[in-house]
Every structure is written in structure tokens, then in C-alpha cells.
């Protein structure tokens, strides 16, 4: 559930992009970054390896203005796609308000997509969450 701070009149919402390695999660955030005016978006932070793969996460803060007098902010994160970074994937899901699952469109990546989706469900379960309790987009 989004964090609502009544004292500062702010709503903060955490959206996590989840999926396989090189499936398009970072590309999604880069596209959003390029489409929004600098006053709306913050600086995009990306921790990538030498091969340009996400090492820990990408982060893009958005300030979407006011909703009924509350300043509305979104924090967009990507998880690393590689299974060996599962601890990072799990940590980034902590406090999630919504998920965008980015499936790789290549036919030969279908099994990896399924494994990544199952991994996401397992990691959500660590926080007592299911796909029935968190809004998501596939």
C-alpha cells in the first residue's frame, strides 16, 4: 500500500519492474525518463556492470504533482534479471506497491520468463504477499 504522510501531505508509491535479464526493464525506465519533463522526473540512477547489465537496481523518482492536496511521488525500480542476484531482487520488492512484469518477447526466452515470474512470486511470499494482493501488469 502506498505510503501516505499526512503531516507533509505526500503520497509515495513504489513500483518495481521485474523480469529476466536483458528483457527490457531498464529500457522501460529509460523511455519513461526521456518522455517526462525534468521538473517531473528526478535523476535516473543505474548501477550497471561492465557489460551494461543491471548489477543491483535502476531507480527513477517521479513527482506527479498534487492529488487532492497531496504531493504524489512515484519511485520506479528495476531488479537485476540474473538469478544469482536473488537477494537483491527480494530486497527491492520490500514495500512494493505495484509491479510491472517485463517479459522477454523472444520465443526462446519463454522458460526464463516463467522462471522469473515464479521467482517473483516466491520473493513476494517472503513478505506475506501474493499476486492477488499487489497490483501488477504483465
PLM feature spans:
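Alpha-helix termini
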Residues: 6, 65-68, 123-131
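Alpha-helical scaffold elements adjacent to nucleotide-binding pockets in ATP/GTP-utilizing enzyme cores
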Residues: 27-32, 95, 112-120
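Switch I (G2) and immediately adjacent beta-strands of P-loop GTPase domains
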Residues: 45-85
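Residue-level signature of catalytic and energy-coupling elements of molecular machines
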Residues: 28, 78, 100
Amino acid at each position: 500500500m502506498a505510503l501516505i504522510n499526512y503531516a507533509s501531505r505526500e503520497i509515495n508509491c513504489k513500483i518495481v519492474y521485474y523480469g529476466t535479464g536483458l528483457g527490457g526493464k531498464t529500457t522501460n525506465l529509460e523511455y519513461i525518463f526521456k518522455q517526462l519533463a525534468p521538473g517531473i522526473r528526478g535523476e535516473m540512477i543505474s548501477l550497471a556492470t561492465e557489460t551494461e547489465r543491471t548489477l543491483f537496481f535502476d531507480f527513477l523518482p517521479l513527482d506527479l504533482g498534487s492529488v487532492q492536496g497531496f504531493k504524489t511521488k512515484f519511485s520506479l525500480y528495476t531488479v537485476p534479471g540474473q538469478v544469482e542476484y536473488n537477494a537483491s531482487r527480494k530486497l527491492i520488492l520490500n514495500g512494493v506497491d505495484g509491479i510491472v512484469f517485463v517479459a522477454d518477447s523472444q520465443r526462446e526466452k519463454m522458460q526464463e520468463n516463467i522462471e522469473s515470474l515464479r521467482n517473483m512470486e516466491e520473493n513476494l511470499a517472503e513478505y506475506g504477499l501474493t499476486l492477488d494482493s499487489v497490483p501488477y501488469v504483465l
